[in-house]
Amino acid sequence: MEEEKETEGLDLAGYKEKIPPVNKGFLTWEKDLVFTARIRGYQFEYDPQAQEGCWPTDTLLMSLAGCLAIDVVSFLRKMRAEITGFKIDVSGERNLTPPQYYKTMEMVINISGKSITPKKMDRVIALSQEKYCSVYHSLRKDIKVDVKYNITNE
């Protein structure tokens, strides 16, 4: 019952309402195997040699971390936690043969602040994975995604 009160009304209203139903961007060939991606006014480069940009799978890994981060920070703020530091260390193990998809992804959240408890962290991570993180729900179902955290209360 107490957990229900603590998470009652937790949603991403406002943030999720601004997400368009269709995203559009474009990718331009620059040279060799270097491409520039542009979406919503932002740009980044892809380069399989990792000299002028990153691999597409790198941005997939970071997209998952970004989606999780937005959910976790949004929910913790609604739970009246004060966040003073937040970082996610990410890693992914890929299949060795084509298609070289991620077999596992690991996210380690390092968070500091006030009123941040393991119970709150477990709850907000579960909400992100079960309902809100669109990147998580866009991944292959056989990818093992492990999320851990380290809390430093100040």
Residue ranges and their predicted role:
Residues 1-62, 73-154:
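Extended beta-strand/beta-hairpin segments
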